[in-house]
Amino acid sequence: RYIIAWKLCTTMKTSDVTETLDLALQASGCDQAHVVHKPRLLSDNGSSYVSGELAEWLGDKKMGHVRGAPYHPQTQGKIERWHQTLKNRILLENYFFPADLEAQIEAFVDHYNHQRYHESINNLTPADVYFGRGQAILKQRERIKRKTMESRRLQYRKHAA
């Protein structure tokens, strides 16, 4: 769920997709790392995703491409939900310049990645999971919960006696 790259575009051309994918590969380090399994692109069947230009670009990068079933947005459920959440936030204000909109999106992505807890990932932030801190945080929460319960039991026993 961690958003590693995004780009505000005025069109939905294949070049916009490849530039955004380049940003994602650079941010993740996959553009320079020697990995056994390159990332795969999961997309819908929009014109920019079914183009020969994108297929060639993915081939050059040795990346796979999985397309969701037509008229079945649930395949891309996580990113569709993210787009809906972003859209709901963005529509709260008016933006008169693209730079204002970009700044708001950047702030939202930072909040989404680092501050917003997700129930579906054990109330961790996407950054916690992406950077491998999730298990340590969950163990720490469990220790705190155990100590709190012990403290409450002790207080209850003192009060009951």
Mark where each language-model region is:
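RNase H-like DDE/DDD metal-dependent nuclease/strand-transfer catalytic core used by mobile genetic elements
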Residues: 2-111
